[in-house]
Amino acid sequence: MPCIQAQYGTPAPSPGPRDHLASDPLTPEFIKPTMDLASPEAAPAAPTALPSFSTFMDGYTGEFDTFLYQLPGTVQPCSSASSSASSTSSSSATSPASASFKFEDFQVYGCYPGPLSGPVDEALSSSGSDYYGSPCSAPSPSTPSFQPPQLSPWDGSFGHFSPSQTYEGLRAWTEQLPKASGPPQPPAFFSFSPPTGPSPSLAQSPLKLFPSQATHQLGEGESYSMPTAFPGLAPTSPHLEGSGILDTPVTSTKARSGAPGGSEGRCAVCGDNASCQHYGVRTCEGCKGFFKRTVQKNAKYICLANKDCPVDKRRRNRCQFCRFQKCLAVGMVKEVVRTDSLKGRRGRLPSKPKQPPDASPANLLTSLVRAHLDSGPSTAKLDYSKFQELVLPHFGKEDAGDVQQFYDLLSGSLEVIRKWAEKIPGFAELSPADQDLLLESAFLELFILRLAYRSKPGEGKLIFCSGLVLHRLQCARGFGDWIDSILAFSRSLHSLLVDVPAFACLSALVLITDRHGLQEPRRVEELQNRIASCLKEHVAAVAGEPQPASCLSRLLGKLPELRTLCTQGLQRIFYLKLEDLVPPPPIIDKIFMDTLPF
């Protein structure tokens, strides 16, 4: 029979004792099987044989030990070009009627100590040799009754478990080697497939197997990277019997993600099948429609029993009262049901109305105070350039200069008051016509109130909004008796000890009030109520519990006095118009004509 030459070297000359036993079967890194099937007619090794394993592993002889075991039987001759050789090899001379197998150690990652793989191993891998992820095997003696399976030199697989380290264990292991039909598989370390049956030979083996904790059953479409486990390699070792890991059935992913729990998918009212939630609760279509009709029609039901009737799939239509009460008890929301005004829209829970940023009393009060401070002159910037304390009184009529000064002070105050009003929260949202109407109607009142609050009646000083400071006598000819009424009001206002926040609210109430001819009186009223509430809360917080009502009433009692002083100011303007010394500015004339009470 012609020789099937080993891929990496020639067989050993004779199977000596060293060839049967490896120096250390637990140390090697790789086991690479090579086979040399020979017959009595086998020829010596061809000269084209590849270099032996020792050529590549020079210096690593201690790491790679070889051994032989003989398989009896007659091997049929091969029809090849080398069959004409008549000389026998050294291995066939030793055992002419048997076939020899040569195994080299191979590496097992994670099982036994040994050197890591080197560049030689990668070179051998590229040459087409197989790597097996099982632990290292042990040699087997030549046995007459051993019948090897018909395997190709490189198609055999050693399975997922290590063979026994005894001769008898290796024999039982090699008897059950299946014939691999596919191409060589890449290494897949520790990916053991589940065992399928017991094996008494493994139970007798001293090899200890410790199963992995990550047992897993595959579903459809999944496959292991290694061949199927051998039937004879079931883990019946005493070390596995007590673990319970392999005895416990592991459910697959599909089994775990099966049917939902018993309560899911059921109507919370009657227990019928329910596919989704309705009005906040998982209910069936029947209870959904019943609840919807009851809410839309505002139906009233009466229970003929004790208001505890059973509500289930069979008896849900017997008592409508108890059924509707159970709908409410499980959490169905009536506000979500669409009414006639919401047709075409999905019902939603009513949300809280969003308030503007300045809607809260604290924010509103802060805005009013800021607007007041920005519109008034600071104490450090008062203008005393025209102030004269000692002025001789003029008993005659006013001249043109005094009238012009009077008009200039009114016109300057109007522009400052307009800018102040624009900073009041909510005033800019009103229509332009309403803004002008409110501003022109309250101008004289605001002029008096702001002048009275800034002035110092005890010293006879009048501080105008522009920062100009004049003495009472300097304004007597232009303002007439009106200036004395303003100073009297100033003394009364100062006696109340009104602080800046309260005065800011009071000034806003003078502007934001009901006037004849408003286009949107409702919006003006809402803004007025917000400012009044803000003033009330501030006075209550400052004055204390016993006196908030009296303080607020005294403060609001100044508003009628302002109306009286406003009428007195209109009379003064009317008088100056009759004198016709200086024509009034157009804006003052318009205000006069629009605010006349007659």
Swiss-Prot record:
Domain NR LBD: 360-595
Residue numbers spanned by region Required for nuclear import: 171-466
Residue ranges of the region described as Disordered: 1-44, 131-158, 177-206, 221-265, 341-361
Xref: SMART domains: HOLI (SM00430), ZnF_C4 (SM00399)
Chief location of this protein within or outside the cell: nucleus
Annotated spans, AF-2: 584-595
Residue ranges with Low complexity bias: 134-145
UniProt GO cellular component terms: chromatin; cytosol; fibrillar center; mitochondrion; nuclear membrane; nuclear speck; nucleoplasm; nucleus
Annotated control of activity: Its transcription factor activity is activated by binding cytosporone B (Csn-B) via its ligand-binding (NR LBD) domain and stimulates recruitment of coactivators NCOA1 and NCOA2, but not NCOA3, to promoters. Csn-B-binding is also accompanied by its translocation to the mitochondrion. Its transcription factor activity is activated by corticotropin-releasing hormone (CRH) and forskolin. Not activated by binding cytosporone C (Csn-C).
PTM notes: Phosphorylated at Ser-351 by RPS6KA1 and RPS6KA3 in response to mitogenic or stress stimuli. Acetylated by p300/CBP, acetylation increases stability. Deacetylated by HDAC1.
Listed result of changing Y453A: Abolishes binding to activity regulator Cytosporone B
UniProt record similarity statement: Belongs to the nuclear hormone receptor family. NR4 subfamily.
Protein name per its UniProtKB record: Nuclear receptor subfamily 4immunitygroup A member 1
Lineage: Eukaryota, Metazoa, Chordata, Craniata, Vertebrata
Primary gene name: NR4A1
